[in-house]
A protein has these predicted regions:
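Structured beta-strand/loop patches that form or line metal/cofactor-binding pockets in enzymes
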Residues: 2-26, 37-40, 226, 232-235, ...
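N-terminal cap/recognition module
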Residues: 29-72
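Hydrophobic alpha-helical segments, chiefly the membrane-spanning helices
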Residues: 353-355
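Internal, well-ordered alpha/beta segment that forms a basic, Gly-enriched binding/recognition surface
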Residues: 64, 69-184
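Intrinsically disordered, low-complexity regulatory segments
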Residues: 123, 127, 137-299
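Conserved small/polar residues in nucleotide/adenosyl-binding loops
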Residues: 342-349
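Intrinsically disordered terminal and processing segments
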Residues: 1-5, 90, 97-112, 250, ...
Length: 356
């Protein structure tokens, strides 16, 4: 059969409107790709330079609707580094719970979109069913189903609702049972295995050279997770290790990348359960900083030349925020905001070109 080019887009692999992907195919085999990015460039960094440090959180929620909590937390940690703000331990545990719930919800969306692409519509329905459990818990924390605006400089918006720990534990234990159903559905499906095993081989060295991080590089056997390599929040107080696959000599395939995400969902659920048990409580614990310059108002200005930086483990890979203070001239607005927000996705797309 003659090779031909077809256009997939402008679209995102699972939604619409974000990029165009031209694909060269030979029958059912993709032999080359040409990605064209930048369809929804919004100038978020420049917008943030005209906002104070508290207002910026709202924009970060909208950087990725499937992982809103991740990006707002990544920014907050950079802002706290810049402003030299200390965060209560209870607030850090609450943040960890919110971020890991978001990771599970994001991975469920990934797997739910992946299943019908390889001929398993049931997987989509099941994943969306369990994603609702996570969305309900996130809505309890932030008051919204998508844009939570939950973290604050110095803590979080509110403490855990009454009875949240009990409800969260019950739903996570149910979810851990449902993960076994996913594995039975997919790992025992001949069609799923044929369409994922031996497809899209990539070695860890190739991924690292392309800047790929997150689950994809761990699926290739590279043991790098920001939460483990450079612990932040309370991750060094939890009982866990990064989920890493052991691929074949040819490298990781699509099946390995599915497996690592399933293990990460199980791992995140166990981390939350561990955190709920270890979280400090009582009248002397707080969910916000006790600094009167922080609570309920925009934080004080950052000195000119002062910088803040934080890198964060998003559900798709490593994300980073860099902030620079502007002193008296900029007031409570940052001089510069730089967010490497789509680094992992863009790197994955670049690797896809080579794999093609």
């Amino acid at each position: 059969m003659a090779e031909m080019w077809i256009s997939m887009g402008p679209q995102h692999p699972m939604t619409h409107g974000l990029w165009t992907l031209k694909v060269k195919i030979d029958g059912e085999t993709v032999v080359d790709t040409e990605p064209d990015l930048g369809y929804i460039h919004r100038g978020v960094e420049k917008i943030c330079e005209a906002r104070d440090f508290t207002q910026i959180t709202t924009y970060c929620d909208r950087l990725c609707y499937a992982s809103a909590n991740t990006w707002s937390h990544a920014y907050i940690y950079a802002a706290e580094d810049l402003l030299e703000v200390e965060v209560p331990e209870r607030a850090e545990y609450i943040r960890m719970i919110a971020v890991e719930l978001q990771r599970i919800a994001s991975h469920l969306m990934w797997l739910g979109a992946y299943c019908p692409d390889v001929g398993n519509l049931t997987g989509l329905v099941w994943c969306l069913r369990e994603r609702e459990l996570m969305m309900d818990l996130l809505q309890e924390l932030g008051g919204s189903r998508m844009h939570y605006n939950f973290p604050r400089v110095g803590g979080v918006k509110r403490d855990l609702p009454i009875g949240f720990a009990m409800r969260c534990k019950a739903k996570l234990k149910l979810f851990l049972d449902r993960i076994q159903e996913y594995e039975a559905l997919l790992d025992e499906s001949t069609i799923f295995l044929v369409r994922t095993q031996g497809v899209g081989y990539a070695k860890a060295e190739e991924m690292i050279n392309h800047g790929v991080s997150g689950p994809n590089v761990r699926a290739a056997g590279h043991n790098y997770d920001v939460r483990w390599a450079h612990p932040y929040s309370v991750y060094d107080e939890l009982d866990w290790e990064p989920s890493v696959e052991r691929p074949s000599i040819k490298g990781s395939d699509c099946y390995d990348r599915y497996r690592v995400r399933v293990e990460e969902m199980r791992q995140s659920a166990l981390m939350i359960l561990d955190g709920l048990d270890k979280m400090p409580g009582g009248a002397d614990t707080h969910y916000q900083s006790g600094d009167p310059a922080i609570i309920g108002k925009a934080p004080a200005r950052a000195a000119e030349g002062q910088t803040g930086f934080h890198h964060f483990e998003d559900s798709r890979g490593e994300s980073m925020f860099y902030l620079a203070g502007g002193g008296e001239e900029r007031g409570k607005h940052p001089y510069r905001v730089s967010c490497l927000l789509y680094t992992s996705d863009a790197a994955d797309e670049g690797l896809g070109v080579d794999l093609g």
